[in-house]
């Protein structure tokens, strides 16, 4: 199966379960992490033909997605004597995808890269759309570029080795897509047998459908708003809260998708308090998240600090926080005129 991301410039295809043989007449630099390399690198190498292949592994986890690790990656690229015709392959989850794309975008002012995601979260979100970057002390993904891959290959085979926690985290991003753009997808999600899904024993077709539905939705959004001027902001549903939670917990307590799950619950509570979402729809999202074992609560210790952290969000402008809300489910809304009092009141409900 193939889905084309039809951009005015730099259009590309996402191949789902179609990874066969990749041929290059240049050097190839594979960026991965130790776990994925141990599980799947031999499989990937058997499918690549190139002049030379270089392999670099970096520690995985949001806490390592920073400028220090980026410098390490770039040094390995220079030591490999890559040129502008070389190709970087990001082979891993969302962290590897973000860092690999960023490295490719700034190495010698840009080289080609290909995403081969190995987590569900990366398949449905991080690997498609061209957002790249790293975190710093001020927040998540505040340093980065928009830089599109030449191709993306999503293989359900790789997902079979994921933990139930990793699969659930990917499902959170899929739920986000449904809540913003297609209410009917929630019906599909509710029919999935959570036990076989979380054990990765479900039919490959389930993974294929999840990936395809997500990419079809996201590609349509990216095609209309590649640089996130407005419409693409809706893909950040739950993320305004999630990024603060991740930053406050040093990126160690929650997987990204888990933080997004909590963020969606918080965003829904805000929408509920503002009269933009009804209780039944808010509860429906909670029930679906719980079905897949995702967290739905976070204890805020200092409401004022949490509130101030919102202003480091990339969607904030002119001292206003742009919140992405579901109003109703299946239809996203960007609202930047919410009073501090209303925001604080919602945050206090999570103390």
Swiss-Prot record:
It comes from the Bacteria. Binds 1 divalent metal cation per subunit. Can use either Co(2+) or Zn(2+). NAD(+) binds at residues 60-65, 94-98, 118-119, 131, 140, 158-161. The gene is aroB. It catalyses: 7-phospho-2-dehydro-3-deoxy-D-arabino-heptonate = 3-dehydroquinate + phosphate. It is found in: Cytoplasm. HAMAP family: DHQ_synthase (MF_00110). GO terms for molecular function: 3-dehydroquinate synthase activity; metal ion binding; nucleotide binding. One of its GO terms (cellular component) is cytoplasm. The keyword Metal-binding applies. Its main location: cytoplasm. Keywords: Amino-acid biosynthesis, Aromatic amino acid biosynthesis, Cobalt, Cytoplasm, Lyase, Metal-binding, NAD, Nucleotide-binding, Zinc. The keyword Nucleus does not apply. Catalyzes the conversion of 3-deoxy-D-arabino-heptulosonate 7-phosphate (DAHP) to dehydroquinate (DHQ). Its EC number is 4.2.3.4. PANTHER family: 3-DEHYDROQUINATE SYNTHASE, 3-DEHYDROQUINATE SYNTHASE, CHLOROPLASTIC. Pathway: Metabolic intermediate biosynthesis; chorismate biosynthesis; chorismate from D-erythrose 4-phosphate and phosphoenolpyruvate: step 2/7. GO terms for biological process: amino acid biosynthetic process; aromatic amino acid family biosynthetic process; chorismate biosynthetic process. Zn(2+) binds at residues 173, 239, 256. It holds the Pfam family DHQS_C. Its cofactor is NAD(+); Co(2+); Zn(2+). SUPFAM superfamilies: Dehydroquinate synthase-like. Belongs to the sugar phosphate cyclases superfamily. Dehydroquinate synthase family. This is 3-dehydroquinate synthase.
């Amino acid at each position: 199966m193939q889905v084309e991301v039809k951009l005015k410039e730099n259009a590309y295809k996402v191949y789902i379960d179609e990874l066969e043989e990749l041929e290059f007449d240049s050097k190839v630099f594979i960026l991965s992490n130790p776990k994925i390399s141990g599980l799947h690198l031999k499989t990937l190498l058997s499918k690549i033909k190139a002049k030379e292949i270089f392999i670099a592994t970096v520690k995985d986890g949001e806490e390592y997605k920073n400028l220090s690790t980026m410098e390490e990656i770039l040094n390995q690229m220079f030591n490999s004597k890559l040129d502008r015709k070389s190709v970087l392959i990001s082979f891993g989850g969302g962290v590897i995808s973000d860092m690999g794309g960023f490295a490719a975008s700034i190495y010698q002012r840009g080289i080609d890269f290909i995403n081969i995601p190995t987590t569900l979260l990366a398949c449905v979100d991080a690997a498609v759309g061209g957002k790249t970057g790293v975190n710093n002390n001020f927040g998540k993904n505040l340093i980065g570029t928009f830089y599109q891959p030449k191709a993306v290959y999503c293989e359900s085979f790789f997902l079979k080795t994921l933990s139930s926690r990793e699969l659930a985290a990917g499902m959170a991003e899929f739920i986000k897509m449904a809540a913003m753009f297609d209410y009917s997808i929630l019906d599909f999600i509710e029919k999935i047998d959570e036990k076989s899904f979380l054990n990765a024993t479900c039919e490959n077709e389930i993974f294929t459908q999840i990936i395809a539905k997500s990419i079809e939705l996201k590609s349509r959004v990216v095609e209309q708003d590649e640089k996130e001027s407005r419409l693409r902001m809706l893909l950040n549903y739950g993320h305004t809260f999630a990024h603060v939670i991740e930053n406050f917990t040093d990126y160690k307590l929650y997987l990204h998708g888990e933080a997004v799950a909590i963020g969606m619950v918080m965003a829904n509570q805000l929408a509920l308090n503002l009269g933009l979402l009804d209780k039944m729809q808010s509860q429906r999202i909670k029930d679906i998240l719980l079905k897949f074992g995702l967290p739905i609560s976070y204890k805020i210790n200092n409401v004022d600090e949490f509130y101030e952290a919102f202003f480091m969000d990339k969607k904030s402008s002119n001292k206003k926080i742009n919140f992405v809300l579901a109003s109703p489910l299946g239809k996203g809304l960007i609202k930047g005129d919410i009073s501090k009092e209303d925001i604080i009141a919602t945050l206090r409900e999570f103390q």
